[in-house]
Amino acid sequence: MVDPGVSPGCVRFVTLEISPSMTMQGERLDAVVAEAVAGDRNALREVLETIRPIVVRYCRARVGTVERSGLSADDVAQEVCLATITALPRYRDRGRPFLAFLYGIAAHKVADAHRAAGRDRAYPAETLPERWSADAGPEQMAIEADSVTRMNELLEILPAKQREILILRVVVGLSAEETAAAVGSTTGAVRVAQHRALQRLKDEIVAAGDYA
């Protein structure tokens, strides 16, 4: 929710809130994946219905919603879902969340799409969530933007790994534990990277006077 007193184009801070729904969804997904691997068609359908919105959010954050030079986020998301379902019979639970396995496929497909488009880096996202959620903490804050262009510019100043962690935590909604498993890091390192990224964005906004 944007404060009435905030003028268009400005960015404001809101306190981070914990949202356990994504973690619960990840736990349910881990359980139903085992049933899908065993050949349960209803479980397979549930897996697809669960992962599709997650994949779409990730691809739109990494690719953008508008097709450029044949690059479409929704097309990439469809490829990710197809590749994931195709790989399910060979999937083995090795103690990592299934969302980490899904992220690996999604990151690979996004990289393929950028190579095909002749780009070395991700396009900025056209859409970002109105509310960001992460672990509560007095120094950790989320940023809402009326100007999507401004937010894209802010995200681009971050190192690639910090930007990726923010996308997984904020846009996709993974827990710190799930994000750590996805990027091959530790929960503590993810929280530190997230805090540093948010602090850098905050400092940039304050320095630019882009707040109310």
Swiss-Prot record:
As for family, the record states: Belongs to the sigma-70 factor family. ECF subfamily.
Gene Ontology MF, one = DNA binding
- Bilayer-crossing regions: none
Which Gene Ontology terms describe the biological processes this protein takes part in?
DNA-templated transcription initiation; regulation of DNA-templated transcription; response to heat
DNA-binding region (UniProt annotation) = 176-195
Q: What PANTHER family does the database record attribute to this sequence?
A: ECF RNA POLYMERASE SIGMA FACTOR SIGD (PTHR43133:SF58), RNA POLYMERASE ECF-TYPE SIGMA FACTO (PTHR43133)
What if the gene is knocked out?
Answer: Not essential for growth in culture. Upon disruption about 260 genes show significantly decreased expression while about 200 showed increased expression. BALB/c mice infected with the disruption mutant showed a moderate but significant decrease in virulence, surviving about 30% longer than wild-type.
**Protein name, per record:** ECF RNA polymerase sigma factor SigD
Matches recorded under PROSITE patterns: SIGMA70_ECF
Q: What induces it?
A: Positively autoregulates, probably directly, expressed at a relatively high level throughout exponential growth and during stationary phase. Expression decreases during O(2) depletion (hypoxia) and after heat shock (5-fold, 45 degrees Celsius).
Origin organism of this chain? Answer: Mycobacterium tuberculosis (strain ATCC 25618 / H37Rv)
Give the highest taxon in the source lineage.
Answer: Bacteria
